[in-house]
Amino acid sequence: MKTTIEKGKCYEIGDWLVQIDSIDEHHIWGFGADSDRVMGFLALPIDSQVTREVSINDYINYIDVTRQNIAAEFRERLSQYEE
């Protein structure tokens, strides 16, 4: 069964949690996070496998954890260059 996606809603698409910004004939555009260290605006192929719809609260929590993980990694990398 194919999941219908809608602008403004959040979905798990592959390894990404994405809030959909727009959809065109080739891409699904949105802001999302992948695993624990990558986040940003992205374009996924229109035929990407949508696993499930995600609640906005789950999406926000996931983005927040990703942001914290990125900040921690950034601090760790900077500490390597401190005297």
Predicted stretch roles:
Residues 2-14:
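Short coil-to-beta transition motif at edge beta-strands of beta-rich domains
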Residues 37-83:
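Intrinsically disordered, low-complexity, charged/polar segments
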